[in-house]
């Protein structure tokens, strides 16, 4: 997509909204020159902020609403009472065709509930999944689900594998991303029934040549595969564990380099290397979790991020629109279904069924 398109922004979602949202959009404006912005929220607070960024204001409109979804609101309550909230109206803009996608740093559960209710799921997708990036020794990988579905059956996991593959191709530019199912061991007999059934289905699918079987927790950071598929329960624990471990080692380094004069001197000598490491592991670089499987593009920013992180979330949304992400998911699902039907009609499968 080379023509201009609009991104709807939940201007009141996040710990530092609307300041962070407006400042982030201005940063993203340079990266995404073909984008217009629809800010949804309290116009009295948004307009003065836009006045600070004339170039952004020139490509922006504001849709006023005084209501916002509270960060601690239950999804069911937000869905029932938040019809006029900035989050809901931003999603409505996508459903109405006024925007190509929506970005919000608001309540994750509420955003998922509203997006699924308003936008619905793509044909062939039973449940949407949350996907995001992980830094690895080999670059970056994609992991899903990160919390939308605590329990998943084999069909859900296969659908996640398809969506993760398309996401990796679209955003990371990998032609043949490898896929693995997160499990408690790499042996075929390990894991519960659903994950073993999913593995069997993937081996018989159009993704078979890139499916690497089961991967374990230590394979995430190693970058053993490009796409890691799991249920939302395990995925969310893995995500939070990785975030906590990164903070732990950052604190360890800080304390170590403050421990003595010689340690401080060592830090000064290695300052350039540590700056590269800091940039490589900066969580703002990986901000922007995608709700995959919906009929519209919906990206969730971390609620506590700053303008740089929010700009990256906008960049993810823009990439998905530009590369026709949802259309590619539809094509991949159709190809997968055709391969499964062909396998079912093959002489080998017919003979096996007869036996």
Swiss-Prot record:
Keywords: Cytoplasm, Lipid biosynthesis, Lipid metabolism, Phospholipid biosynthesis, Phospholipid metabolism, Transferase. Its EC number is 2.3.1.274. It comes from the Bacteria. One of its GO terms (biological process) is fatty acid biosynthetic process. One of its GO terms (molecular function) is phosphate:acyl-[acyl carrier protein] acyltransferase activity. It is found in: Cytoplasm. The keyword ATP-binding does not apply. GO terms for cellular component: cytoplasm. Pathway: Lipid metabolism; phospholipid metabolism. It holds the Pfam family FA_synthesis. InterPro entries: FA_synthesis, Phospholipid_synth_PlsX-like. It catalyses: a fatty acyl-[ACP] + phosphate = an acyl phosphate + holo-[ACP]. Disulfide bonds: none annotated. Belongs to the PlsX family. HAMAP family: PlsX. NCBIfam families: plsX. Homodimer. Probably interacts with PlsY. Catalyzes the reversible formation of acyl-phosphate (acyl-PO(4)) from acyl-[acyl-carrier-protein] (acyl-ACP). This enzyme utilizes acyl-ACP as fatty acyl donor, but not acyl-CoA. This is Phosphate acyltransferase. The lineage of its organism: Bacteria, Pseudomonadati, Pseudomonadota, Alphaproteobacteria, Rhodospirillales. The gene is plsX.
């Amino acid at each position: 997509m080379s023509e201009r398109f609009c991104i709807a922004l939940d201007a009141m979602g996040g710990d530092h909204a609307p300041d962070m949202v407006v400042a982030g959009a201005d940063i993203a404006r340079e990266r995404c020159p073909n984008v217009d912005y629809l800010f949804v929220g309290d116009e009295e607070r948004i307009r003065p902020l836009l006045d600070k960024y004339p170039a952004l204001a020139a490509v922006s409109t504001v849709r006023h609403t005084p209501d916002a979804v509270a960060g601690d609101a239950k999804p069911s309550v937000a869905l029932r009472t938040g019809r006029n909230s900035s989050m809901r109206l931003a999603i409505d803009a996508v459903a109405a065709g006024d925007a190509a996608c929506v970005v919000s740093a608001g309540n994750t559960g509420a955003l998922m509930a509203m997006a699924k209710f308003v936008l619905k799921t793509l044909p062939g997708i039973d449940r949407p999944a949350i996907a995001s990036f992980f830094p690895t020794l080999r670059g970056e990988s994609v992991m899903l689900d990160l919390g939308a579905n605590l329990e998943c059956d084999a069909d859900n996991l296969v659908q996640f594998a398809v969506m993760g593959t398309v996401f990796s191709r679209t955003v990371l530019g990998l032609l043949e991303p490898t896929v693995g199912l997160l499990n408690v061991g790499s042996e075929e007999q390990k894991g519960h029934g659903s994950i073993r059934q999913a593995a069997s289905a993937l081996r018989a699918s159009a993704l078979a040549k890139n499916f690497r079987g089961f991967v374990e927790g230590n394979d995430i950071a190693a970058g053993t595969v490009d796409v890691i598929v799991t249920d939302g329960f395990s995925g969310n624990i893995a995500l939070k564990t990785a975030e906590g471990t990164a903070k732990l080692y950052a604190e360890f380094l800080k304390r170590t380099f403050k421990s003595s004069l010689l340690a401080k001197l060592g830090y000064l000598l290695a300052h350039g290397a540590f700056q590269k490491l800091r940039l490589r592991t900066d969580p703002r670089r990986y901000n922007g979790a995608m709700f995959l499987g919906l009929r519209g593009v919906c990206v969730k920013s971390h609620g506590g991020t700053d303008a740089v992180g929010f700009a990256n979330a906008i960049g993810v949304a823009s990439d998905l629109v530009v590369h026709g992400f949802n259309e590619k998911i539809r094509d991949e699902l159709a190809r997968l279904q055709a391969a499964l039907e062909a396998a079912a009609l093959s002489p080998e499968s017919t003979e096996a069924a007869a036996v």
